[in-house]
Amino acid sequence: MPIQLEIVTAERVVLSEEVDMVSAPSVEGRVGILPRHEPLLTVLQPGELHYVKNGVSMPYAISGGFMEVLPNRVTILADTAERADEIDETRAEQARLQAEQAMRDRQSTEDLARAEIALRRATVRLQVAKLRRNRQ
């Protein structure tokens, strides 16, 4: 019995598909979801979201959000979500370099926190893009 997975951002429905398993970066650690999982609501942190369908793992870069789990449905409300083939590696690398520079130039703890979040997002995007490149 598959799980209905929906990944939604403010701009669009990124994915609506039946899958075999979902793995997401919760603030409490990585969470794996299989069919008939107990209901769960959790906060997601920036990281790699994977789903498995027919034995193939598909990675997405997400920048945080929420995940609602019902026995046969998972809904991801993400700040942003990108498939590996949607990521521009050059732009992601530029964002990583800018975030590192912002961390060095910080003026306050808020600046540092923003720069750390930007660095994490850029790093995740690069990791997911690398997964795509390694599969080709």
From Swiss-Prot:
GO terms for molecular function: ATP binding; proton-transporting ATP synthase activity, rotational mechanism. It is found in: Cell membrane. InterPro entries: ATP_F1_dsu/esu_C_sf, ATP_synth_F1_dsu/esu, ATP_synth_F1_dsu/esu_N, ATP_synth_F1_esu_C, ATPsynth_dsu/esu_N. GO terms for cellular component: plasma membrane; proton-transporting ATP synthase complex. It is a peripheral membrane protein. Keywords: ATP synthesis, Cell membrane, CF(1), Hydrogen ion transport, Ion transport, Membrane, Transport. It holds the Pfam family ATP-synt_DE_N. F-type ATPases have 2 components, CF(1) - the catalytic core - and CF(0) - the membrane proton channel. CF(1) has five subunits: alpha(3), beta(3), gamma(1), delta(1), epsilon(1). CF(0) has three main subunits: a, b and c. Produces ATP from ADP in the presence of a proton gradient across the membrane. Belongs to the ATPase epsilon chain family. This is ATP synthase epsilon chain. It comes from Herpetosiphon aurantiacus (strain ATCC 23779 / DSM 785 / 114-95). The gene is atpC.
